[in-house]
């Protein structure tokens, strides 16, 4: 990555975070803006209707097809939290996901490390794809269903570098209040959520300097995070395709993949489904954003409701 490209991305990041500052949003708020935003929201909903409102139509489209569930973790199964180490899934959500996995092949694709997601979800019998799909594990084909095997790690050569960069960034950012660096095995995340606006530029500059020293890493942006990951052509969309292939159903016309996620990194998976012309994405968001998703849900509570209705529908089709 060129230094100018890095600088441009950093500047864009700082500008976007500044624009999202609550004080700036409130200071420019007026009745005219409310009306305008309502119109924009209505237009957006028309393009990405609620998956709850459209549930019956979705299920009609699913008749005779094998539904495969792909779920993001943060902001989808769990709430976004100030402390990223405390983004716990509720017992109720865990039980719903367990039921979903009973009736449908299920995978959780997250930017976190696979081990961290597994420690939160605590369910066996499902596929986990951590580090944005760079660390994929799934159930074995043996009778010992509690065992799991590594299926794919396309960035394994980068492990020593990631370990090194995590330590470098922790040292460089320790003087910036609120900044934290999370080791996600095959990528790393710099969290902005607790950093005051006055510290954004300094933090971004430290990330820029690290990227100059480690040109084999690339920069991506998520919800109040910067992420550094290997410069390989791999993302959540590639992970979705890999899982469909590994399950032996990638070429089947009777499969309906459903991906639910809230972050811009999930757009790679939404885009894959659009390009396949098979299945659909559901964006979890209370705000208007550009997306390849077909439907929307507002928050994890609505995700839970959608999954509950999905399980109920399946039980009814089976006569249970």
From Swiss-Prot:
NCBIfam families: HAD-SF-IIB, T6PP. Belongs to the trehalose phosphatase family. GO terms for molecular function: trehalose-phosphatase activity. Its cofactor is a divalent metal cation. It is an enzyme of class 3 (hydrolase). The keyword Ligase does not apply. GO terms for biological process: trehalose biosynthetic process. This is Probable trehalose-phosphate phosphatase C. Keywords: Hydrolase, Stress response. Removes the phosphate from trehalose 6-phosphate to produce free trehalose. Trehalose accumulation in plant may improve abiotic stress tolerance. The keyword ATP-binding does not apply. Pathway: Glycan biosynthesis; trehalose biosynthesis. It comes from the Eukaryota. It catalyses: alpha,alpha-trehalose 6-phosphate + H2O = alpha,alpha-trehalose + phosphate. InterPro entries: HAD-like_sf, HAD-SF_hydro_IIB, HAD_sf, OTSB-like, Trehalose_PPase. Its EC number is 3.1.3.12.
